[in-house]
Amino acid sequence: MKLEKLVGDRFKERPADCQVDSHALMIRGGYMKNVANGIYSSYMPLKRITRKIEQIIREEMDAIDGQEVQFPVVMPASLWQESGRYDSIGKELLRFTDRNGAQMVLGMTHEEAAVQLVREYGQSYAKYPFMIYQIQTKFRDEARPRAGLIRVREF
């Protein structure tokens, strides 16, 4: 596809709000756009790069018998309460009540879900060893998003 057909504006000047060179280059090149503080839209060049990296990770993990899983974005708060991290993590963890009154969290990590999987699946020694991995977008209500894609809210 020709460059002029790609969605996303390209700039000659460095954006004033960019602190890191790589961040400035991606904005200038039309790879992404800042939608809100610490939240970016990825356009086709960056999506292609991301897909290629994910493909390499999948190939390498599959080669060593890794099993790709996908945990839910929204999890019951009880998983986080059981681990003790529900109260220890501050405002970065988004908490809400669903329409049925259940306490839920928007998972910024998925260790709790992984532990639940291992606890339920790994009841017998015969099932070990096994390896799981996931590639997924997460959200953390970062207090001070900065440095381009290094410290963002959605990652």
Put a short name on every predicted segment.
Residues M1-F155:
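TRNA-recognition modules of translation machinery and tRNA-sensing kinases, especially anticodon-binding
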